[in-house]
């Protein structure tokens, strides 16, 4: 992802423009998968994670390619998803601070809720009431009626919400029973807080955990709650008694994910130690190690197509999602106490997953080299790649000087070239009238920057620098009526200046001093402070030295012998550059400069000190 940002003086808000360099279709999860939802009716699995994309997969094992579609609108991690309305609607929560409502069958975003002020970390769903709750790092819990959310339109886009207040710390987990009568939240406060969503009343606070509560589950009638914590324990709570009635020490490290069967008799747990256990809640000595993943477990989803569940889907900090069979899981016996003796380790029920949804690699490190063209990256597969931002065209060097271009401005024009407001009609009014009279009025609209284009599928994101997203769209969609209207409201003035008014920002100037080198024996000049664009190449300074300093000295020495002829008049302008490079050397810190360098490079990589840049010149020895 690349970005440009400026201060928006109108709203006193810093607006950042970002874009994503990617393939048109991103079929693979590119990082850890935070959330899973299974639609057994359509045999579809929804995955969402750290690459901001929600993907739909077929879980039919007979399909060679399980990928179905991607749902893209978020601009940061997707932390949780829930399927509602019998699989027709999907709700998602993201670190971009939004909650989004999706048509799960057609795969498009229907509406965006911007009530939260920080990362939205967890969702909870009451199936019988079609009620969803969202919570996050802003310590707020909001309640949403799903039927109201799905009825929102461009003209009818107002929605009311109830909120549950009282949390003192960031919320990382949330649960609501199917009847919609109880909500429980878990946070870094290390307690469970309980509300009645019907009245928004606080009911109780449950203490017992010693670290962040990362996972919560409620039984159907809301009388019992299971919690998993970074303290490594699973606790069973009686809400009627308002106390913990059982503690299960199954894992060696933090418990981050829980699932439970419909009868609320067996809990499936996973976490930082990469192990997935099934524990009998009625007899905690009866537990089985189902499998061991290759990375910490973030989320699990039971296949509830039968009872007992035949399989469980597991997502980890890696991009691959695995399905593990649960056949034969209830044929095990008590395994003794919970102290996992390393000399007698428990054998996993499964050593290989039953089905694999393969993920892709993601870039985890990058370094831009000094030439600002080449980049080194390292991905999650430990592959190091060497990239170049601009390919050599293979043409010979053109005659004359290179044009001065602002690549950032050209890029902004390319990103918004489909936005009608940026289009320019070069015909003046008189030409328009003549062509109209002659019946020759033609479409001569100029789009883009005239140099290059970006792929139409490129995502463009406007957002507050270091904060929330204001608007996201694909390049090709900026011509749409709705998108154009939103761009008019969102695009900051500094981008308007470049893309609509075609006013490129002025080049930065660098002040410098120009003096003869000590070895030249020339008299030191009056120390005049010069300035030039930081993009100015060293060869241009050499031309200045040759034409304005060396040539003037030669003229004064040869005036009597040359009569009315002057060397400067005899030389063609294009020859000056060649002669300057043949006869002049420019130095900084006693290092001879490459004529292709620009002043910015000289200042940052050779001068390397405070104060104004000082350059020295001398004539090459013949």
Curated annotation (Swiss-Prot):
It holds the Pfam family DUF3337. Residues 554-565 have a biased composition (Low complexity). The modification N6-acetyllysine is found at residues 214, 523. GO terms for cellular component: late endosome; lysosome; nucleus. Its main location: nucleus. One of its GO terms (molecular function) is double-stranded DNA binding. GO terms for biological process: DNA damage response; double-strand break repair via homologous recombination; positive regulation of double-strand break repair via homologous recombination. Keywords: Acetylation, Cytoplasm, DNA damage, DNA repair, DNA-binding, Endosome, Lysosome, Nucleus, Phosphoprotein, Repeat, Ubl conjugation pathway, WD repeat. The modification Phosphotyrosine is found at residue 28. The modification Phosphothreonine is found at residue 558. It is found in: Nucleus; Cytoplasm; Lysosome; Late endosome. It comes from the Eukaryota. WD repeats lie at residues 28-67, 73-112, 115-154, 166-205, 208-247, 250-289, 292-334, 358-397. InterPro entries: G-protein_beta_WD-40_rep (IPR020472), WD40/YVTN_repeat-like_dom_sf (IPR015943), WD40_repeat_CS (IPR019775), WD40_repeat_dom_sf (IPR036322), WD40_rpt (IPR001680), WDR48 (IPR051246), WDR48/Bun107 (IPR021772). Belongs to the WD repeat WDR48 family. The WD repeats are required for the interaction with deubiquitinating enzymes USP1, USP12 and USP46. Interacts with USP46. Interacts with USP1. Interacts with USP12. Component of the USP12-WDR20-WDR48 deubiquitinating complex. Component of the USP12-DMWD-WDR48 deubiquitinating complex. Interacts with PHLPP1. Interacts with RAD51AP1; the interaction is direct and promotes formation of a trimeric complex with RAD51 via RAD51AP1. Interacts with ATAD5; the interaction regulates USP1-mediated PCNA deubiquitination. Interacts with RAD51; the interaction is enhanced under replication stress. This is WD repeat-containing protein 48. It comes from Macaca fascicularis. The gene is WDR48.
